Amino acid sequence: MVEVKVLVEGYTNADSVEESGTEKSCPTITLVRDKNIVMVVDPGVLEDQQMLIDALKKENLEIKDVNIIFLTHSHIDHYRNVGMFQNARVLEYYGLWEKNTVDDWKEQFTNDIKIIKTPGHNYTSLTLLIKTEKGIVAIVGDVFWKERFPEKDVYADNASQLAESRKKVLELADFIIPGHGPMFKVEK
């Protein structure tokens, strides 16, 4: 069975940036392990590199052990640290990157890991649906910033697509790992 572990709990003050004057964000960085896959989802921003390295060490892993980086969407706060992972292939909206080539990804990545398109926040938004012992975990990027983020996403490319993507995720998932907060249970 697939193991899913939040390595770094994300944060953002984007919903209150007017009060502070400065926006600070780090995505929720997640580890996914399945057979020979050691995947990091949304490796984050430069100022949080050491926090990521330390979190991997707690899992008895080093940067070189990671073989796939999955990017939920193409916003820099989610992908800036991708260059740290020299041994990893990058899986994102346009495909699976190995050096300078890309192969189309398949909707069914493994038996227990499925990729779905969830546009709205960004047209490149993808969600991982992972079958675990606890149920289906959805790693959604900024489809949901955090559990109680306001309905209106001021950064959304397309609000109606985002609403549809959120609805789809809520129907499919038992737990959601949002873009900038702790995992939460879906109330059904």
How should each PLM-predicted stretch be described?
Residues 16, 50-52, 79-81, 149-150, ...:
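Short glycine-/acidic-enriched loop or helix-start segments at secondary-structure transitions
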Residues 22-24, 119-122:
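A short catalytic or substrate-binding loop motif that flags glycine-/basic-rich loops and adjacent residues
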Residues 123-188:
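Metallo-beta-lactamase
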Residues 1-4, 33-38, 106-114, 131-137:
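Beta-strand-turn-beta hairpins that frame and shape the catalytic cleft
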Residues 20, 24-26, 44-111:
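Active-site HxH/HxHxD metal-binding segment of metal-dependent hydrolases
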Residues 41-43, 65-75, 81, 91-94, ...:
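Active-site neighborhood of phospho(di)ester-bond hydrolases with catalytic His/Asp-centered motifs
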Residues 28-30, 114, 124-128:
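Short beta-strand micro-motifs in enzyme catalytic cores
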Residues 1-36, 167-172:
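Zn-dependent metallo-beta-lactamase
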